[in-house]
Amino acid sequence: MSQKTAGKDYLTMDDVELDNKRILLRVDFNSPMDANGNILDDRKIKSHLYTLRSLENSRVVMMSHQGRPGDKDYTTLEAHAKLATELLGRKVTYEDDIFSACARNAIKSLEKGDILLLENTRFYAEENMNRAPEEQARTQMVRKLYPLFDVFINDAFSVSHRSQCSVVGFTEVLPSVAGILMDREITGLDKGLKCHEHPAVFALGGTKAKDIVKVISDILKRGGADRILTTGVVATVFMMAIGIEVGEVNRKFIEDHKYLDQVSIASRLLKEYSGKIIVPKDIALNNDGKREEVKVDKIKGDLPIADIGPETISDYSKFLKEAKLSVFHGPAGIFELESFRLGTEELLKAAAQSNYSIAGGGHTLAAIDQLGLESKYSHLSMGGGASITYLSGEHMPGIEALKNYASRCCKD
């Protein structure tokens, strides 16, 4: 019977025998791709290399998704297998199906040290449904595949906020453990989640305002933050909530992205948690590519907000430097444009000086990489939206499924 590592309520790869075993490994290779099917950013694939290298004496079958139905990047995983081969220095074979007879035969023929990547899991319709683990265990995917394996490893923290069959279904029918990346994410984020030192400061920006407004609500509800520093589109929503006239072009952006309902939610949060949510004092407008800094009550109607201003940068930086815990998610401005990366750069430098620093989100990590700040952060999360969901204390079905398996198998 497996035994949990002390202090953990799930099993890790150290807790089970993996040598020459048949391993089903859920990874997240979902990456930005160009129109020709080339992968533009290899960080997702690189993040799983530690796990793959530790399984060199096993027979490994990987599952991943790419894009969503209807998206331009909703495509096969052939390019991912080729890139994984290059990065790993070992052959990763691509199988253009998931659980057909052909795919199952390919799995059965694997020898020790072989690695196979199955087709995009979202090509299977039921993968796109969020259901309870016991329901997912009855899907064709799980029923066809699970008899071919000895162990299921979930290394895909970044999709573990979803209750999809490739994430939770196999935990009902196979010995199930966390991969190295998964374990690192949970351990690193837990230090932030369970931090009882103050102040705890969150700098939250980017364009996904609806997601972040919910996260702000959840974090404040559980008393997890002393300050929330708003930037990006998130800040625009909160500025509108306190009656600031953000200008026609910025208001239209909020309307077009269906974020107007978030303004009323933001207004309620500002009243309920007075003094905890901080809104910019000044911003930088994009005036034909040039940076035009103005106070928030002087925003011009025809110019888009592209960054926070110098006074806000100074105030926010002070909060972050003095924090016992800092969490940075989402850029403060349009980091891709040189004129509007100042806010993101300065806040990232400040956050790195806090006692325990966490950063996540694709654009944020890219900025940290460009600034050479990787070694300055306590934990860099590859989890994207899942990392901020985890820090808000929200339910994570993929992780809960691993914990439930450990609870069942490790009973006295």
UniProtKB/Swiss-Prot annotation:
Primary gene name: pgk1
Family matches, as Pfam families: PGK
A GO CC annotation given for this chain: cytosol
Record PANTHER family: PHOSPHOGLYCERATE KINASE, PHOSPHOGLYCERATE KINASE 1, CHLOROPLASTIC-RELATED
Keyword Cytoplasm listed: yes
HAMAP family reported for this sequence: Phosphoglyc_kinase
GO biological process, any: glycolytic process
Catalysed transformations (reactions): (2R)-3-phosphoglycerate + ATP = (2R)-3-phospho-glyceroyl phosphate + ADP
Positions that bind substrate: D28, F29, N30, H65, Q66, G67, R68, R122, R162
Binding, ATP: E336, G361, G362, H363, T364
Subunit structure: Monomer.
Enzyme class: transferase
Molecular function GO labels: ADP binding; ATP binding; phosphoglycerate kinase activity
Protein name: Phosphoglycerate kinase 1
UniProt entry keywords in alphabetical sequence: ATP-binding, Cytoplasm, Glycolysis, Kinase, Nucleotide-binding, Transferase
Subcellular location: Cytoplasm
EC number, as in UniProt: 2.7.2.3
Entry's family note: Belongs to the phosphoglycerate kinase family.
Pathway: Carbohydrate degradation; glycolysis; pyruvate from D-glyceraldehyde 3-phosphate: step 2/5
